[in-house]
Amino acid sequence: MELHVLNHPLVEHKLTVLRDKNTPSSTFRELVSELVMLEAYEATRNLSVVAAPIETPVAPMTGKKLASPRPIIVPVLRAGLGMLDGMTRLIPTAEVGFLGMKRDEEHPTQQVTYANRLPEDLSGRQCFLIDPMLATGGTLVAATHYLAERGAKDVTAINIIAAPEGIKYVEEHIDPSIDFKVVVCAVDERLNDKCYIVPGLGDAGDRLYGVID
């Protein structure tokens, strides 16, 4: 597993405003989108490209374009949807799949899959899993293996905040045959007894969309 933690003043500034409990949902959503675009720049560094002959107004040249098959972006519902706009603005030609998973509250590292909209065959595809929080690591491992069962071998997770416990769990449980990377804005102190990241930013889904009772 390869872990990349962004180190940039713009990331630190935006993340501080994002964490603030007084930041309204509208601003929170915009900041998530902006942070994801900054993360995606690093996460997409190894996207496959092919030669593309073109003509500029001055002369012919050979540039580069994204190769086929197209990369696929997979938000983990529901909080991952808040990161989708930033990703598709950067890679508008990417395909989008959806994966609904939620943590079993009695067994925090176990997941319940309740929805999926994914191609049956992900062989040869570069996959980007997006979910704001890497807390226990259970969702990320389950989602990655879900993609791997469909043939994915190149998976990059983009999370805004991670907990050390979650990173450790992922390192210990991810299938080593997968080319797996994680890009985060920050690694926080720890998880509390409710498996929330500390200091964290609260429940990302609730802050993006409001609380659903």
Curated annotation (Swiss-Prot):
Allosterically activated by GTP. Its cofactor is Mg(2+). Uracil binds at I197, G202, D203, A204. It is an enzyme of class 2 (transferase). Binds 1 Mg(2+) ion per subunit. The magnesium is bound as Mg-PRPP. Coiled coil: none annotated. GO terms for biological process: UMP salvage; uracil salvage. This is Uracil phosphoribosyltransferase. The gene is upp.
